[in-house]
Amino acid sequence: MSPAAAAADGGERRRPPLGVREGRGRTRGCGGPAGAAALGLALLGLALYLVPAAAALAWLAVGASAAWWGLSREPRGPRGLSSFVRESRRHPRPALTASPLPAKSPVNGSLCEPRSPLGGPDPAELLLMGSYLGKPGPPEPALPQDPRDRPGRRPPSRSPPSSSTAQRVHHVYPALPTPLLRPSRRPPHRDCGPLSSRFVITPRRRYPIQQAQYSLLGALPTVCWNGGHKKAVLSARNSRMVCSPVTVRIAPPDSKLFRSPMPEQILSTTLSSPSSNAPDPCAKETVLNALKEKKKRTVAEEDQLHLDGQENKRRRHDSSGSGHSAFEPLVANGVPAAFVPKPGSLKRSLASQSSDDHLNKRSRTSSVSSLTSTCTGGIPSSSRNAITSSYSSTRGVSQLWKRSGPTSSPFSSPASSRSQTPERPAKKTREEEPCHQSSSSAPLVTDKESPGEKVTDPATGKQQSLWTSPPTPGSSGQRKRKIQLLPSRRGDQLTLPPPPELGYSITAEDLDMERRASLQWFNKVLEDKTDDASTPATDTSPATSPPFTLTLPTVGPAASPASLPAPSSNPLLESLKKMQESPAPSSSEPPEAATVAAPSPPKTPSLLAPLVSPLTGPLASTSSDSKPTTTFLGLASASSATPLTDTKAPGVSQAQLCVSTPAATAPSPTPASTLFGMLSPPASSSSLATPGPACASPMFKPIFPATPKSESDNPLPTSSSAATTTPASTALPTTATATAHTFKPIFESVEPFAAMPLSPPFSLKQTTAPATTAATSAPLLTGLGTATSTVATGTTASASKPVFGFGVTTAASTASTIASTSQSILFGGAPPVTASSSAPALASIFQFGKPLAPAASVAGTSFSQSLASSAQTAASNSSGGFSGFGGTLTTSTSAPATTSQPTLTFSNTVTPTFNIPFSASAKPALPTYPGANSQPTFGATDGATKPALAPSFGSSFTFGNSVASAPSAAPAPAAFGGAAQPAFGGLKASASTFGTPASTQPAFGSTTSVFSFGSATTSGFGAAAATTQTTHSGSSSSLFGSSTPSPFTFGGSAAPAGGGGFGLSATPGTGSTSGTFSFGSGQSGTTGTTTSFGGSLSQNTLGAPSQSSPFAFSVGSTPESKPVFGGTSTPTFGQSAPAPGVGTTGSSLSFGAPSTPAQGFVGVGPFGSGAPSFSIGAGSKTPGARQRLQARRQHTRKK
């Protein structure tokens, strides 16, 4: 309490004058104890006040603790309090002095202490409010004074004074609407309890007020602001620390939007005339260019600001790393010296931008003119450069930044650079039209090209001017002048420019410097973004290539050949298409349809090998294409992976991309589907897989989303078929090939591989792409299955976030889509899509089980889940949601998923339920998934699936079969992989194995072990870990599971044990933790056995990913049981019996046993495929990478 109280008090203290005075008054009125307490609190508050973060936390604590304490306290000291209150009511002044103490006990306790519950708080609050209001702005001094006066005034009539004070406050801040509200509140405040509570809140409000000068924020009830705004507040605080008050930061976006356009326009007009005035034609051109650039920049900045608000952008910034942040600081902070040093911190740069924006705007106008005069900075400098101009040395750099800007500005969001760049140009063009549309566009291009050309081609007047600003004499000289010019510029902009000519010598130096700086900067950026930026910008091909290449390796085996051809079209198809939004799309699209269909055949035929490969290829390609987009997992992976291992820089950028992509692109989504597929192959490659993780979350997200997108698009259907085929074959085969070891590798390897493909691999499914899969889907399932599985894996990984949906259906959830999709769904589910839209979901989705799609719809999601629905929703929602394997979970996931996204949902099927188990049936099963009886089997043949239920997972199989039952549980969320990062694989890999029990490792589950698919752990799939963390929450990234990752839970939810099932059950944890999952579970999974999914851990672990892979879904291979999903033994997925068979080997992963059923997961088949290894997880790239990504993501969210 004391800390909270202190924090609260700190808030008051912040209001200092009032607080202090109040404290004094309190001391007098309240008495020694009250005064001492008030002083102590004030001191604490002051200390806290110094630390923004601490203050924020303190405020929260204070609010909760104050209310609680005050309430509990109230009874304790009603006498003193009531008496004080009464007195305060009776005597306004006395109330003020005395009230503080009483207030303390009744409401806030220590916090409130200073104020009386009624009168005390009222006046005090008013004062505080006044101080708050006053504090934010210049009025602040006045306000505090007014409050000071007010205390005296108030005393005369307790009630009237408060109202009058309220009115006064209003008058003081007529613009503030809240004050009006406050008066009404004040009467309640008088009531002590409400007052104190509100009072506590008030300090919070005050914070917001400080945040935004806009009194509005302060005025608004802080309760909402505290929660909702709080993030902003925190960021604001950060900015405040940097330099300007929070106010500036908050205001900038809005003001920027409003102000910047006008000033810019004005500038443009003014600049144009000045340009004409400019004696040198070059100068004129320069000016025009500068204006254009500036507008562009402004637009970009605005976009950035908006985006910045969004996590995606933040992620991009993070991914871009120093490049972007450095950029912003120089540019954003006009002043910047301080900021410049901080280029590293995005937040700061943003904050500084905000604060500087106002300055910049002022300087901008002048600066812009000066800029115009300065050709130099012109474009690159843009208004910001004006400030930068002050640093002549920096200027080159800033220009470089700017230059990248168009390409890079996008830097902030690589993906955005892709999609946005075109958009920005359009926007810029629109804005610039008056100034010079054509020119602006040219400049843009130029800028993009410029990095190389400009340096090489100083000859080009325009570029040069833009770049080096040779025309501008010394860039430093002129720029400095610019600052001087700011004021003078308006008067004589032209005149000044000539003098700068002296700077020409400087210009030469500057040019060199600029070149160097630009080269360095570009190198830096390029390193990060080379592949990213150039490829994306340039063409898909390049990107594709690499991925492709990687893919090949991955596919290695069969795939490679196929992959080449297919790849580009297929994965690309969607991913690119969507993703690229631009270049890729065109090529992509056509291919898409064709591809889809074509792929299908190839896929089908080769199904396995080829399929994979093509998929992979495409995936990769997509990914690269997408790259920017992220596209899908693959991409992501690629990217991610790349970064991880390969390119690293590119990778990074890719990762960024991924992140951004998702947001940025829809395309991304497409990729997603691909993703899956991609992934898979990679899986085989192993390396691929990893990458996925790397991107991991980011990727995932996109991926899924992508999928959806694609789904949505034509692709959906198309995809389906293609995907379908692909998936099955691909995934499986791939998997198979890779098979176990791949898996492992994947997880583990992956890393090493890094290969871009890596990521893709994950994809797993690619399929997904197929989502389509579904189409096939179901059948696929089996086949798909594999694919799916793969997909799943991939997905998982990838998408993870997204959804996964294993089964999703989820998508279906989207069901609707679903259906179709549903198929699509496929494992992979887009879910995200789904999330996305529904439809997409579809795609994504994956649906394990599809069929059901409908179910899907059902909820799809669910693995079977019925839940689905929820899940579905979730799924969709979630988008991510993996939904549990079991879908459902989905749901739950959903929600969480959502967040988490995870949804996974494996199942779909809806059926619900997921049933469990995988096995569904199992109901009884429990056993197994596979239903033990075979049936269930994953695939169960469907047979039986008995439960059939559908889901058939594959039919049959249903993943989960029926049963579902519920377990659903939504929890699901867990998601496959729980995010955890691990995602499927959770990093850790280790883990667990799907089944692993181990949990340990988690395998699936990420990290933490947790997860274990199977684990018995219960955790099960998820578990454990899940629990581990779970929580789904996660957000996580996780990928797979995201979220929570943990939880994964594959399954789910339910926990219940039941569930088992795939999971499920888990439920429980799912979400949360629970974890459970257990894939398999055996029932119950939870523990059930064990085994669960996979029992045996095998480490394999499903997940493992990371590491090892393991996971393999089925992994098979290994047979060794190990894995297998079912691992053998272990029980196998399918439980035992069969199981163990299951796959036992069968490699299979079999989900289901294969053997048994052949179906079995592996099995056979299809799913099985054996080899396949499914790898669900894939991996993730490294946990470290994933964690980093997650951390980034989370930060952005926090922001």
UniProtKB/Swiss-Prot annotation:
Proteolytically cleaved by caspase-3 during apoptosis. It comes from Rattus norvegicus. Disulfide bonds: none annotated. The keyword Transmembrane applies. Belongs to the POM121 family. Keywords: Endoplasmic reticulum, Membrane, mRNA transport, Nuclear pore complex, Nucleus, Phosphoprotein, Protein transport, Repeat, Translocation, Transmembrane, Transmembrane helix, Transport. Residues 10-25, 298-312, 424-435, 446-456 have a biased composition (Basic and acidic residues). The record marks 531-532 as: Cleavage. This is Nuclear envelope pore membrane protein POM 121.
